[in-house]
Amino acid sequence: MALERTFSIIKPDAVAKNVIGAIYNRFESAGLRIVASKMLHLSKEQAEGFYAEHSERPFFGALVEFMTSGPVMVQVLEGENAVLKNREIMGATNPAEALAGTLRADYAASIDENACHGSDAPESAAREIAYFFSDEEICPRTR
Ligand code: RTP
Ligand code: MG
């Protein structure tokens, strides 16, 4: 299978828990490569734009407030089947339903503060990567 890219966020709760490295280790151990990465403190406008598809949902205000409550790490992950693989590493949206050993089972406190984001399809991955990274900021493997 060809290499695929996905977009990932380590959300403010997980950054506050000081588990950026632990989460990066999960990605790398699963064969995903970090090809772009940066720390950001999202503005309200950035968070609203990123989650625009949820703008009519009842949890939208709380989601934007949470996502702007502290710094996040945003990254591009590359590997075989990266979109699905990252979703498996993360576990279910609600940590109460997440399988043991997934990021959300281990690091998330609730469905509202659930440690990480991962694109849900290759199309959303492309859109989300472009939302946060220019082409020059992505450094694919050369050796
Ligand atoms: P994400 O986009 O953050 O990776 O999460 P996801 O695909 O697993 O879930 P999604 O349906 O896209 O929802 C985005 C985020 O909104 C919050 N949410 N809260 N209270 C609720 O019922 C509810 N549902 C979703 C979660 O923080 C979720 O990650
Ligand atoms: Mg989603």
From Swiss-Prot:
The keyword Hydrolase does not apply. One of its GO terms (biological process) is CTP biosynthetic process. It holds the Pfam family NDK. It is found in: Cytoplasm. Its cofactor is Mg(2+). It comes from the Bacteria. ATP binds at residues 11, 59, 87, 93, 104, 114. GO terms for cellular component: cytoplasm. Its EC number is 2.7.4.6. Keywords: ATP-binding, Cytoplasm, Kinase, Magnesium, Metal-binding, Nucleotide metabolism, Nucleotide-binding, Phosphoprotein, Transferase. One of its GO terms (molecular function) is nucleoside diphosphate kinase activity. InterPro entries: NDK-like_dom (IPR034907), NDK-like_dom_sf (IPR036850), Nucleoside_diP_kinase (IPR001564), Nucleoside_diP_kinase_AS (IPR023005). The active site is at residue 117. It catalyses: a 2'-deoxyribonucleoside 5'-diphosphate + ATP = a 2'-deoxyribonucleoside 5'-triphosphate + ADP; a ribonucleoside 5'-diphosphate + ATP = a ribonucleoside 5'-triphosphate + ADP. Its main location: cytoplasm. Homotetramer. Belongs to the NDK family. Major role in the synthesis of nucleoside triphosphates other than ATP. The ATP gamma phosphate is transferred to the NDP beta phosphate via a ping-pong mechanism, using a phosphorylated active-site intermediate. This is Nucleoside diphosphate kinase. It comes from Pseudoalteromonas atlantica (strain T6c / ATCC BAA-1087).
